[in-house]
């Protein structure tokens, strides 16, 4: 991991969304230098599903060697941001660094994204980043080490990253455009950069999106904290950059990236918005011996009369049991096109579960549409549902949480085949 150098000692960092996850990891890294941290987040009381509050984060920061100022801040609320900034200036004498980490996500298509969700993502991601930056800039301009760091992706205009979750992409790219515009506007005064992970990072949000078991395919928030530290300890002329965490750390001399993995050696889930297509990344993983997440099960003897699709559903049926039903509680409908078009369902909700052709007896919780050939590959472990979705080969309607559970279900099924 990247060692601390002490360069942030005495600096004041205003970090949004710092009560947990990546924001807290960045705060703790800076705290080890003896930095002052403003924990600007909404969670003041313990959440039933998400760990941490602004106060527990503050305690950890102080235990790590820093000073902490917990502030209740919803980045959509101008008054709350202004009040927190004033408290920070009163407590620490100014603000040197702003980290715009707070973010909201909904991986849903246009018709399935309510305007409430659109407003939430635009309000937190784009407007919140712009507003917090605007309020902090007068103080940042007085600092000799002024930085703004937005946790947002490179501006990749490949339509693949828009078509399945247009609203989320617009909201995240809004953060990136803030970095692009403000870096030029304040060149020489404030360094402004964006940071994005190469792979999925294990956070509470990722657990909610991917369900249990997704952690093995993720890296720890520490990799983003180290990359952020590397950026924030550079001079002001390092500005206007869209940085990828692992690429920067390799430039900084970090050779062993496995130390950041939750399960070292396990294949990693690529993050959104990067140039490599999901299929290219999957191929690269396989070339380097990463087989665990793409494991094809033991081959079954095929019936001479059964088609590949029928064989696939027979194999699925053999894996359905009460345990799978109890842990999943969902009905999947598959609308298949191509060589073997038709509707099939997987019931992991009622009684002992079941598989069949046509539509389920009760309404499906998730409807997945894709080519029958790709469906066969997906259930053979040769194509991950996440990658199929990201590349546009899989379209999803309904409960996204249940849809993301399918990856774990497939892994369990393939292990039994």
From Swiss-Prot:
Its EC number is 1.-.-.-. Keywords: Mitochondrion, NADP, Oxidoreductase, Peroxisome. It is found in: Peroxisome; Mitochondrion. GO terms for cellular component: mitochondrion; peroxisome. NADP(+) binds at residues 17-23, 42, 74, 172. The active site is at 168 (proton acceptor). Residues 306-414 form the SCP2 domain. One of its GO terms (molecular function) is oxidoreductase activity. Has apparently no steroid dehydrogenase activity. Might act as a metabolic regulator that affects systemic adaptation to nutritional cues. Belongs to the short-chain dehydrogenases/reductases (SDR) family. This is Hydroxysteroid dehydrogenase-like protein 2.
